[in-house]
Every structure is written in structure tokens, then in C-alpha cells.
Amino acid sequence: MFLDTTPFRADEPYDVFIAGSGPIGATFAKLCVDANLRVCMVEIGAADSFTSKPMKGDPNAPRSVQFGPGQVPIPGYHKKNEIEYQKDIDRFVNVIKGALSTCSIPTSNNHIATLDPSVVSNSLDKPFISLGKNPAQNPFVNLGAEAVTRGVGGMSTHWTCATPEFFAPADFNAPHRERPKLSTDAAEDARIWKDLYAQAKEIIGTSTTEFDHSIRHNLVLRKYNDIFQKENVIREFSPLPLACHRLTDPDYVEWHATDRILEELFTDPVKRGRFTLLTNHRCTKLVFKHYRPGEENEVDYALVEDLLPHMQNPGNPASVKKIYARSYVVACGAVATAQVLANSHIPPDDVVIPFPGGEKGSGGGERDATIPTPLMPMLGKYITEQPMTFCQVVLDSSLMEVVRNPPWPGLDWWKEKVARHVEAFPNDPIPIPFRDPEPQVTIKFTEEHPWHVQIHRDAFSYGAVAENMDTRVIVDYRFFGYTEPQEANELVFQQHYRDAYDMPQPTFKFTMSQDDRARARRMMDDMCNIALKIGGYLPGSEPQFMTPGLALHLAGTTRCGLDTQKTVGNTHCKVHNFNNLYVGGNGVIETGFAANPTLTSICYAIRASNDIIAKFGRHRG
């Protein structure tokens, strides 16, 4: 589908160049365009999910009529908004699987013993190396399920929309905090975060009330609070903050994604004139003014390749663009942002690399050599991951009587829903209406229980329910832990292996500390204890630890913070020693965290955008 933004112009530098079109890149674009800056955004993938809205000034502008006549298509729409997936959430599992590309697949130790001996096979000396297959990847230190999504909107086209705030302990100097420090002063830090979170929630549209009239949601939420209150145990169950809104037909909800953030850049003719979006364009690297470590530097231009002309005619000079801007933002996700910056350490052919090892790389033998990054020494170091436990339960039969006769006051709407359903379907063994919205319950991270909990029903790349089970009585439990940042945990990029898009192959080196492992065991115990209070395990979905990386919340790859010796950028996400280079996304978060990071990453994008606007802003009519 044609995207109606301002065409690319090579003859005039942009104010801001942005690599990446997920919610973080979109936040940069929105705020910079709102501040009268000209923005060029490139996305390696295609635009494959759309909504449409009226143009600004149209008398129907307040209405949201999807794909009405004469309306403007907006990319980056959440694919779960399709009616078929709202009616059957488990069918969305395959959409997620299709969107994800695994980052690093070990191959050196994979011998297929039963392969026909006369066919092509791998060997120890020459293992397979295509499409993420990585001979340099040690399987014992891999994040085996870490994956990326390429396309306008990024993972926001299939995410859960969970947008909790990070935990900050009362003691500013407590040994662990989810929420990073943006100031050394406790009061100022709290004020900054309060303001940023408020803005971020407005941008993405966070709510905790969209499931208030769900029977299952209220059943799970109220039952758990009653159980723990009777046991004299302090555990606070509350609605999970979600970026969504309930539609006029209460059976349906609209899940928010990048389209919400980009909307005015398509519907407002003035803003659209300052915004260019190039899809199927790979940001190959940034070219720097010089390559001398430790000295003040800046980006000269972004080297971008249009993949469509190249696909039709390899070597077509029209496929390569040099995009000049006053400031540059790389916000392609935790893996790809670091990938672009690592690849940027390999300069054009006519530039001599001044740092030792720049020609051959480091990190092992020639075959497994990695790209050195002395211009950004902390790039890829101190990465963090979320250990994750999962199970599904079938609700206790006794709870069906609670559904028929809820013991809590003020629930006439509940009783009316049940009565209508029972009357319409007297042979249904379950009194819950077919279109009753799913539960969306959370337990927040605390010092006593340092993990994030989601008790709900949603689609992931795993956890689909068998067709012969009624999903109305299935509840999912996902517990997310955290790992402490360690310098030895790192993401590096190979010199001699390439990914599917001809970029340096990522390789993980990640292990959990003893404290991390002990905490994960406690988290599993907690999940089992909580889950069994209202049901029994669904066969095949008993409690289990998930493959590392499956949470898709990798962070720390481009960490930003107050300590210049342990970070890639400052608290405004400006890369150290570069006056016009910024990073965005979950990779900037320097702390270990258990909650979903998108809202916090939007906060960083707001703060960084304000810095860009202050430095590079100028009035435009």
C-alpha cells in the first residue's frame, strides 16, 4: 500500500534521521515533527498492517471509521485488532510466530546423524551459516528465543500492550531498583519520572479500566484479593495497565500500536509535509566524521539501502542512499540498534581504521572474529534478560457457582450478562458469556516479591489451547523475573557471518548469577502457589521455565545512564563523545527489570526528543 508522506529529497538535509519505526522511533518522530523539525524515518521491513483515519479538518475527524472512503491509511496497526483474532485469540499465536525472526541459532554442535549420507550436510569445520545460523554461538550462553520483528510498527503490531511503570524503592540507594536513575537527587529523579510517565501514558494510551465489565477479569481479581486477605498475606492484585480502549461494541477492544503515535503525521497536512517514511530501507551504518576513540565526534551521514531496487537489480546505484541530517536516532530494537552501531565501526573503504584490531577483529579465532567497537566501549555489554515461568490452569468448578451468584456488591451488570447467556444457551455447562473479555490482572514488583506477574489470557508464540478445551475457563500465568547487569553478559557481532538482511550476525554471551538463579526458583514457587489457589494445571501447560529470550525484553545493549564509564549514552540517550547521535528502545535501560519495558522506553524517547529539539530545533511556519 502507498504511504502518503513527503517524498525523500536528497538535496536538503533533514533535521532528524530515525532508524526504526516501532513505538520508540515513532515517539521520536511525533515529538520532533510537532516541534517543526523535518524527519526522515527508515524501516528495514514493510508496512503490512493498516488502519485509516479522516484528514484533519474533515467534519468526521472525531470518528474512527476504519478504511472509510477518502480516509488516510496509517501503518503500524496492531494485527490483533482483526475481528477474527478478537473472536479467537489462540489463532493469533501463528501471527506472532510468523512475525518473529530468531536472532542466533547455534550450529557448530548440530550433527544430523540420520541424514542421507549422500546429501549435502554440515561439518565441524564448515557448519551452516544462513538465516541466523551461527557457528560462533555457544548454546550454553545463548538467548535462544531472542527474536526481532521487521516491519512498520515493529513488535507493537503483535505485543501484549502491557504498560506498567517500573518499581522504585522508597530508599533511593536501595541495592536494586527497576526504575533507573535520571538524577543523583532523589526528589528531582522522582519528579522527572512522574512527568515522563504521564506523557508516555498519554502518547500510547494506557488504561486500567477497559476490562472493568469483564466477568472473568473481576472473578480472578476479586477472588485472589479475597483469598489472600483471608490468609492475612499482603499481595495486591490489580488491573494490568494496558495500551488499549474499549470500542462502542463492548465485546471488542482496540489494541494500541505505532499507528496511534504516527496518526497526525499522516492526517495533518502540515505535519505530513515534515515527515518522510521509507519502508524496505535498511540502515546499514552511520558514517562518522572520524574514527579516533575518545575524541569528540559526530555522524556525517547515514548509509541506507533501498532493498526493493536492489532486489530487482542487484548493484543498482539507486538502491544506496546517503541521508544527511543534523541529528541521528537509532531505535531499531535492542539487537538491531547495537547491530547498526557495531557495523558503523567498519568505515568506508577509503578510511583507515586507527584502532588496533580494527582490521581483523577480536574475540577468538579468525572464523569467529567479532567487530571491535572502541568508539563505544560499552556497546553490547551489561545486557539483561528476564527469566520467565509459565503455566495455564483450568478454573475450579466451584467458581462457576461464583459466576452465577457473585458475592460482591454492585455487580448488577454481571448478573444480567449471566442471566441472558443462561437463558439463550441453557445447555452450556459454563455460565460465562461467549464474548466475555479475558482477565487482565497483575501483581506489581515489590522488594519482597521481586518479579512482575501477569494473570490473563493472551496470545504469545507459545501457550495456545487445544481446540477441544473451552478457553473461557483457561487462565494464563506469566511471571517475569530480572537479572542483575554484569559486564561479562554481552551481545557481540560477527565479522564473517551475516544475518538474513546482510548485517553482522549477533552472538549472545549470557549467564545468570547465583542470585539470579535463586530468585528465579523463588518466582517459580510463587507462581505455583498462586495458580493452584483457583484451579488445576492444564495438561501440557504445567509450570515450566521458558527458553531464555522468550520474554523479548532484552535490554542494556545500548545502556544509558549517569556513569559514563559503564554506559553507551547519557540520561538523554545521547551517545558519549557524539554531539548528534542518540539511541532509543529497550536497549537503553541500564537496570535489571521484570516489568514490560515499553512505557519506560517511551519515557526515554521523550527525554531524548526534548534534548534534540533544544539543540537542533528551529521555528518553521
Curated annotation (Swiss-Prot):
- Cofactor(s) needed for function: FAD
A single Gene Ontology MF term assigned here is:
flavin adenine dinucleotide binding
What is the activity regulation comment for this entry? Answer: Inhibited by HgCl(2).
Q: Give a brief account of the activity's temperature dependence.
A: Optimum temperature is 55 degrees Celsius. Thermostable for 2 hours up to 70 degrees Celsius.
Q: Which residues are responsible for catalysis?
A: 553 (proton acceptor), 596
Q: What is its main location?
A: periplasm
What about PTM?
Answer: Not glycosylated.
**Subcellular location as annotated:** Periplasm
Q: Describe how the cofactor binds.
A: Binds 1 FAD covalently per subunit.
Transmembrane stretches in the record are none
Q: Where does substrate bind?
A: 454, 456
Q: Which InterPro entries did the record assign?
A: FAD/NAD-bd_sf (IPR036188), GMC_OxRtase_C (IPR007867), P2OX (IPR012814), P2Ox-like (IPR051473)
Q: What induces it?
A: Induced by carbon starvation.
Question: Kindly, how does the activity depend on pH for this protein?
Answer: Optimum pH is 8.0-8.5. Active from pH 4.5 to 10. Stable from pH 4 to 11.
Function, as annotated, reads: Catalyzes the oxidation of various aldopyranoses and disaccharides on carbon-2 to the corresponding 2-keto sugars concomitant with the reduction of O(2) to H(2)O(2). Plays an important role in lignin degradation of wood rot fungi by supplying the essential cosubstrate H(2)O(2) for the ligninolytic peroxidases, lignin peroxidase and manganese-dependent peroxidase. The preferred substrate is D-glucose which is converted to 2-dehydro-D-glucose, an intermediate of a secondary metabolic pathway leading to the antibiotic cortalcerone.
Q: Which family does it belong to?
A: Belongs to the GMC oxidoreductase family.
Q: What is this protein called?
A: Pyranose 2-oxidase
Q: Which gene encodes it?
A: p2ox
